[in-house]
Every structure is written in structure tokens, then in C-alpha cells.
Design a protein with these regions (language model features):
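Phosphate-group recognition and catalysis centered on beta-loop-alpha active-site segments
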Residues: 2-317
């Protein structure tokens, strides 16, 4: 009788183990392929339930009617709503003491007599700033206001679309503050929170799925508006991934925004495909006559323009 060899049967066991490992690896690979195919594959039809398509494209004033009154001011919003516009697009930022104020630029230099960044100022300091004199030396009292002031003032007379501006991916509290105010005033029907940052919109939906969100995007890595209006040190390039349509497609599937806000210079084929798939699309800042006509001809959900009165006239022709 021979001495048992410890190696006897080890090779078959190793073979069985390696076979399981190969099958497990293949299954993981297949799962990864399926996930990537879902995320980066064809655009699904829009299935949102919080947005009702209007009978004609909506017309929003960019920067709160900023070409006709002080930028992002309540004074401008009142003028826009009085003119019969469907809504306004404004910008929200957090102050140093975590108040959400409506202000376009990252710094206050261009629009006020003060200097410095919004994030470095308290709410009291921001609300003391007058937007009037830089727009018109004769205009006084068009002060900066909070998001809460805007929500309370609009009261459903139009739609208030607020771009939440954040410095990065880290949680800043801006989403929670915005959602708290929407809930306090039961403003779900007339407030939309928008952002270039999909993480911001994801957080908003985690806080309250009934708050309507809009994902903003463009194809270029620079914003002509920012270049023209804001100090060069404030201009932040749009990250490469957010300029790639295959990545944006995956973002739309994960974040599930209720609307899209698309720059009018985005690849026309992308814009046409999204509209054909049923996405409620805002086209932002077509300002020249021809650009407005092209945008409205696509029958989008709406346009956001610095020339909203002309856009309104063209739409109603």
C-alpha cells in the first residue's frame, strides 16, 4: 500500500476552482458590458411625469430680463412678468453664511460698486448691494435679494428657473436650502432648479423627487457670456466629460432630469434627436433674429433669451 500523495486530486480541484473563476469573471464582464451598453447606448424616450408640454414654446428672460433691467434683480423679474413672459432664468449662489442669494457672476465687481466673491460675503453684505447704478446711474434701490424673496414674489405668476452655481462636487448645502424654500412655499409648480453639475441635480432629487430639475449643457469648453462679462479669473472651463454626448447620455439615464437646457450652439443632430425622443428642451440664449427663428422652428419646450420680447413676437406670429 503506497503512501498517499498530497498532490493527488489537487489538480482537479484547482481546475474546478479556476473554471469557476473564469465563469465568474466572464459573468462580471458580461454584466459590465450590459451596464455600459445601457448607459452609453441609444437615447431612451423621455418618461418624465412632472412636466406638461405647453401648446407653444415658452419664452423665458435670461438673467431675469438682464438686458432690460439690472441683472438678476427682482426689479427685472417684475418687468419680465409684467411684459407677459412665461418665466425667468436667474442664478443662485450660497453666501459665506449659507444663505441662497440670486446673483449671476461669481464676483460682485461687474454688477455692483463693491468687490469680491459672493462666496466670501455674508447674506447681509450681499443684500446691501444695489444693482441699479451700474445698469443706470439714475436707478437706485434694485438690491440683491434672496432666493426666498424671489419665490415669495413670483407666487406662480410665471416660472422661476434657478441655476444653482457650486464650486465643485463637494456638498455645499445649496441643494438643501433651495429645496427647503420650495417646500415651505409649496412652489413645486412654478420653480425649476437647474445646473451644469449633474451631482447637484441628483442631490436635489434625493431630497425631494417632486422638485423639477433641468440639466444644462453645451459643447464648447468656454462660455462666451462668461468670457464677455466676468473677470478672466472667474471663468471656469466646462469639464471635458460634460461636453461629450455619450457621457451626457449616461448622466441623463442616471440623474433623470425633468428638463434639458441646451445651448443654442450645441450639435444640431443632438438637439433634434432629444426633441424627437420627447425630451422637454429649453434652448438657451438664441438672441439674434436668425438664431431665434431657428430655435423656435424646432418646437422646443421653450427658449431662454436675452431678447425675450422679440422671441415672444416671433413665436406668436
Amino acid at each position: 500500500m503506497g503512501t498517499p500523495n498530497p498532490a493527488d486530486g489537487a489538480a482537479p480541484r484547482r481546475g474546478r476552482a479556476s473554471g469557476w473563476a473564469r465563469r465568474a469573471l466572464a459573468a462580471c464582464g458580461l454584466a459590465l458590458v450590459l451596464v455600459l451598453a445601457y448607459l452609453f447606448g441609444c437615447e431612451p424616450r423621455y418618461r418624465g411625469t412632472l412636466v406638461v408640454r405647453p401648446p407653444r414654446p415658452l419664452v423665458f428672460a435670461h438673467r431675469g430680463f438682464g438686458d432690460h433691467a439690472p441683472d438678476n434683480s427682482l426689479y427685472a423679474v417684475e418687468r419680465a412678468l409684467t411684459a407677459g413672459l412665461d418665466g425667468v432664468d436667474v442664478d443662485g449662489q450660497l453666501t459665506r453664511d449659507s444663505e441662497l442669494v440670486i446673483f449671476h457672476d461669481l464676483s460682485v465687481d461687474r454688477l455692483t460698486a463693491d468687490t469680491g466673491h459672493v462666496r466670501d460675503k455674508t447674506a447681509a453684505q450681499m443684500l446691501a448691494l444695489d444693482l441699479g447704478p451700474k445698469y443706470d446711474p439714475r436707478l437706485r434701490g434694485a438690491n440683491v435679494h434672496t432666493f426666498e424673496d424671489f419665490v415669495r414674489d413670483v407666487k406662480g405668476r410665471g416660472i422661476l428657473m434657478v441655476e444653482l452655481k457650486v464650486p465643485g462636487l463637494a456638498a455645499s448645502g445649496i441643494e438643501r436650502r433651495a429645496v427647503e424654500i420650495i417646500q415651505r412655499y409649496a412652489a413645486h409648480d412654478y420653480v425649476v432648479l437647474s445646473s451644469f453639475n449633474p451631482v447637484v441635480l441628483y442631490r436635489v432629487k434625493r431630497l425631494d423627487p417632486k422638485v423639477r430639475t433641468a440639466l444644462i449643457f453645451m459643447d464648447t469648453n468656454w462660455n462666451p457670456e462668461l468670457i464677455a462679462e466676468i473677470k478672466p479669473g472667474d471663468v471656469v472651463n466646462l469639464p471635458w466629460p460634460l461636453r461629450q454626448e455619450f457621457i451626457r447620455r449616461a448622466i441623463r439615464k442616471i440623474v433623470r432630469p425633468d428638463l434639458l437646457s441646451i445651448n443654442h450652439q450645441v450639435d444640431e443632430a443632438v438637439l433634434d434627436r432629444l426633441i424627437a425622443k420627447g425630451w422637454p428642451v429649453f434652448i438657451w440664449t438664441p438672441d439674434e433674429e436668425n438664431a431665434l427663428r431657428r430655435a423656435l422652428a424646432k418646437r422646443p419646450y421653450g427658449v431662454i433669451s436675452d431678447q425675450p420680447i422679440r422671441a415672444q413676437q416671433l413665436r406668436d406670429q
